[in-house]
Amino acid sequence: MDRIAEDLARDSHSGASEMLVKIASSILDLSDGDIDVVPESDWIAFGIRLHEAKPTIATIFNLANNIMLEAEKGAGSSRRILAMVASMMEGERCSVERIAEAAGSIIEAGRVATSSYSSTVSAALASVAARRPLKVTVAESLPGGEGRLFAKKLTDMGIEAEIVPDSNIYAIMAEMDCVLTGADSVSPHGLVNKVGTRALVEAARSHGLPAYAVCGLSKFSPVTLSDMVVTQIGSTEGPSERSQIFESTPLDRVTCIITEDGALSPSDIKERFHGRTMASGWSSIDL
């Protein structure tokens, strides 16, 4: 199991959903002989190692938490863990299709503004475009500028797209019908995504437009995990530079989050966190 955690730590290219499926598959590939002799304490330690390998990824935290919860139940934990892992993997594989189908039914728009790069957002937009003519305006999403790649992806999918500077989002909002964003994680404190997401949402609200997000339930985390990744570059000859990668948008600024279970309002989302159980093994580390 050490190898699984080490492989996860080295994975710098996969998205959160893909990481979950890869790790789940690796766990299910463990031989029956190895699985049956793993003590509960080793499963708990393994869960902690998975989280420490990717401490900002909600899908991995939820997998680790579920492994630890099953281990804490005692005898027979290995078989319960395998069944749970298989269920999570299958659910993750099906979730994007279900989210896209729900988004296509909910979003009645011909002009949509978005930002950054998200496979879930692209699937949702494809579902919308299959029902009505659609043009998408994509903020370039600095730092990183992955909005340009996303606009190219949409064009390759046959969806009309244009790119605008981030500073133009408010100026073009009067032409839009709604905004759509993805999410790296959702906690009781807000939706964490690429910086610029809140500006997009607030611009929509100021124009009386709906602000939708699309996100699988596997990204719902009872604790805030994502590091905002702020960098400061000093200079001896001129101004310093500061750059932030992620930001949190309060849940009440979003019209709804479209999940595989359909549209969830801010109050619905907060209700989802009531009664969420955290493994006691987390007490050994600083979350």
Task: Enumerate the predicted regions with their spans.
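Short, active-site-adjacent cap segments at secondary-structure transitions
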Residues: 120-122, 220-221
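Conserved active-site and cofactor/substrate-binding residues in soluble primary-metabolism enzymes
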Residues: 3, 14-22, 38-41, 45, ...
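Long amphipathic alpha-helical segments
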Residues: 1-85
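Conserved phosphate- and dinucleotide-binding cores of soluble alpha/beta proteins
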Residues: 139-287
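Ligand-binding beta-strand-loop-alpha-helix segment within the catalytic cores
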Residues: 65-109, 113, 121, 126-179
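Non-catalytic, soluble scaffold/interaction modules
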Residues: 45-73, 84-96, 101, 115, ...
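Alpha-helix C-terminal capping segments
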Residues: 28, 32, 126-131, 201-210
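Short, glycine-rich nucleotide/cofactor-binding loops
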Residues: 10-13, 111-117, 187-192
